[in-house]
């Protein structure tokens, strides 16, 4: 009886916190197996769901635990049901029959799909900046055209948009081998259209694209400013697929409403489904990416070296990958296996060709720029006064110190008048949450970051 009350309370809290689509995907699909010795065993059908439960829902498990059991309940996640999986297997099989995967058409050879095999969900590093985009991509790969159509993912270069597109396609083909899937950059789609138009083979072009189950278009902003005929053809392709309930996933470097040079009717259609953004990885995610990229290279990247590298590049993953390539080249030439900070610094200096460009940001510089922006002195920031403008400036400065430097939590706390590390954690979480809700604050922080760098 208590277990049922406990789980219902968790679902109530989750419904308040998550969007409807995320609630359906993360909460409804989860299942409480048992509560024993203050541990709640929770079944999640996908291991990728654990991050959202840990980051977004763990605290509500604690709250529900005190309400129902008068004890702190710790979650333990499992990804295989201990027994009786028959019903779920039947349900999964039923779900797969809900979608028509063009059985009358010949499946596309993998080499013609445009997909890259190396990009999967398993090797995509999740973090706070991409968790919702990953969630949406996973949802699409589970239920084509039944969840979000189109799915529109946008963000700066090198943040994983192409990886996610390929992961969706590869996941679908793993589960439904006869699905007709096509990944193509928008520029290549345009060139393909123009080639078929020039050769008088438009029927062949239409058959290729309008018979797909899943169309994955990368960098759709490339369509901006193109001739009317080109945009018209994509518009018709989009409509043909959408009308047949076939899935479309698009990526861009900007949101639909900021796509200039596109017909309004296209922009409107891009917003029909779900739009998700990917933001640059935070410090912890950058370290996780570096660990993933370096673990099979045959070199010993020391932990302080990884932290150093994570502190040098904060904009995208490609910079991190480039730095790793430069470092391994130096290591190969020098015939060394242990990668120290000195080796990493040498590679970065050569890469940037200017030591002054390196991101070594002192916390007092962050405090100065934040203080100037909000009209708060560093002394006030380090103090304990709780006036609203001082609290905001203090929390923003702590947030940026966490995001832009590789300093430890205790070190950051010390620089703010000896604050406890939990205060820094709270400030970071608070500002991150506000950024997601308040565009004005997000723009303010972006402006401050530009001044800091």
Curated annotation (Swiss-Prot):
CcrZ stimulates DnaA, possibly by phosphorylation of an intermediate molecule, to initiate DNA replication. SMART domains: AAA, Bac_DnaA_C. Keywords: ATP-binding, Cytoplasm, DNA replication, DNA-binding, Lipid-binding, Nucleotide-binding. SUPFAM superfamilies: P-loop containing nucleoside triphosphate hydrolases, TrpR-like. It is found in: Cytoplasm. Gene3D superfamilies: 1.10.1750.10, 1.10.8.60, P-loop containing nucleotide triphosphate hydrolases. The keyword DNA-binding applies. Residues 332-453 are annotated as: Domain IV, binds dsDNA. GO terms for cellular component: cytoplasm; plasma membrane. Signal peptide: none annotated. Residues 114-331 are annotated as: Domain III, AAA+ region. Residues 1-74 are annotated as: Domain I, interacts with DnaA modulators. PANTHER family: CHROMOSOMAL REPLICATION INITIATOR PROTEIN DNAA. Oligomerizes as a right-handed, spiral filament on DNA at oriC. Interacts (via domains I and III) with CcrZ. This is Chromosomal replication initiator protein DnaA. The gene is dnaA.
């Amino acid at each position: 009886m208590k277990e049922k009350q406990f789980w219902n309370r968790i679902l109530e809290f989750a419904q308040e916190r998550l969007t409807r689509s995320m609630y359906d995907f993360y909460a409804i699909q989860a299942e409480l197996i048992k509560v024993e010795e203050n541990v709640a065993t929770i079944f999640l059908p996908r291991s990728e769901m654990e991050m959202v439960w840990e980051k977004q829902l763990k605290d509500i498990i604690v709250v529900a635990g005190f309400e129902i059991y008068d004890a702190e309940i710790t979650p333990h996640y499992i990804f295989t049901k201990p027994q009786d999986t028959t019903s779920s297997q039947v349900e999964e099989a039923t779900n797969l029959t809900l979608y028509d995967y063009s059985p009358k058409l010949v499946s596309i050879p993998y080499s013609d799909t445009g997909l890259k095999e190396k990009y999967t969900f398993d090797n995509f590093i999740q973090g706070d900046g991409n968790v919702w985009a990953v969630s949406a991509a996973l949802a699409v790969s589970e239920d084509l055209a039944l969840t979000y159509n189109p799915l529109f993912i946008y963000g700066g270069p090198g943040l994983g948009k192409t990886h996610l597109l390929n992961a969706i396609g590869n996941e679908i083909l793993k589960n439904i081998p006869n699905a007709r899937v096509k990944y193509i950059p928008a520029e290549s789609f345009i060139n393909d259209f123009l080639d078929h138009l020039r050769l008088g083979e438009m029927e062949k072009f239409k058959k290729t694209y309008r018979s797909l189950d899943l169309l994955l278009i990368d960098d759709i902003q490339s369509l901006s400013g193109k001739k009317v005929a080109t945009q018209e053809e994509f518009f018709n392709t989009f409509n043909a697929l959408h009308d047949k309930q076939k899935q479309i996933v698009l990526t861009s470097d900007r949101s639909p409403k900021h796509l200039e040079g596109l017909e309004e009717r296209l922009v409107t259609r891009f917003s029909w489904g779900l739009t998700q953004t990917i933001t640059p990885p935070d410090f912890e995610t950058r370290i996780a990416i570096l660990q993933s990229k370096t673990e099979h290279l045959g070199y010993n990247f020391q932990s302080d070296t990884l932290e150093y590298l994570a502190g040098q590049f904060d904009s995208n993953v490609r910079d991190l990958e480039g730095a790793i390539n430069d470092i391994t080249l130096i290591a190969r030439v020098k015939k060394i296996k242990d990668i120290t900070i000195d080796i990493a610094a040498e590679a970065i200096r050569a890469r940037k060709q200017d030591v002054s460009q390196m991101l070594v940001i002192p916390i007092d510089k962050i405090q100065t720029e934040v203080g100037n922006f909000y009209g708060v002195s560093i002394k006030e920031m380090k103090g304990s006064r709780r006036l609203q403008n001082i609290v905001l400036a203090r929390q923003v400065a702590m947030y940026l110190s966490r995001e832009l430097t590789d300093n430890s939590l205790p070190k950051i706390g010390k620089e703010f008048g000896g604050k406890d590390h939990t205060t820094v954690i709270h400030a970071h979480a608070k500002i991150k949450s506000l950024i997601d809700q308040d565009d004005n604050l997000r723009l303010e922080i972006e402006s401050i970051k530009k001044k800091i760098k």
